[in-house]
Amino acid sequence: MSNKHPLVQVIENAQLIERPSFAPGDTVVVQVKVREGERERLQAFEGVVIAKRNRGLNSAFTVRKISSGVGVERAFQLHSPIIDSIEVKRRGAVRRAKLYYLRERSGKSARIREKLAPRAPKVVKPKADA
């Protein structure tokens, strides 16, 4: 339930951009539009989603990567027009909504297990009586 004026809700809903679903622990590649003078190019930022904030038009997420041995975090607005695309590389199996503890970890202790795809249920074949 939202306590916003109905007209504000209509305008905000028109601004929403369709994005793929992802969660904390997932490795994503965010293609960001970068303006350099007259030119505009795409810059890829690949890392692990350590936080996600779902607030409609104000939704945001934080991506962390290690670049030259230094941890780099970047926060993005989910529905921002500067984001060209978001691609989910792998799904991570985590048990927390915010993965801020990864900031203190490095190397193998900072790894995240991969979420396995659900298996098809086994079909039990009835034995044929001969």
Curated annotation (Swiss-Prot):
GO MF, one example: structural constituent of ribosome
Transmembrane segments: none
Disulfide bridge map: none
Pfam families: Ribosomal_L19
Cellular component annotations (GO), alphabetically ordered: cytosolic large ribosomal subunit
Entries under Gene3D superfamilies matching the protein: 2.30.30.790
InterPro entries (alphabetical): Ribosomal_bL19 (IPR001857), Ribosomal_bL19_CS (IPR018257), Ribosomal_bL19_sf (IPR038657), Translation_prot_SH3-like_sf (IPR008991)
Keyword Ribonucleoprotein: yes
PROSITE patterns in UniProt: RIBOSOMAL_L19
Record-level GO BP terms: translation
Keywords, in A-Z order: Ribonucleoprotein, Ribosomal protein
Function: This protein is located at the 30S-50S ribosomal subunit interface and may play a role in the structure and function of the aminoacyl-tRNA binding site.
Entries under NCBIfam families matching the protein: rplS_bact
Similarity section: Belongs to the bacterial ribosomal protein bL19 family.
UniProt name for this protein: Large ribosomal subunit protein bL19
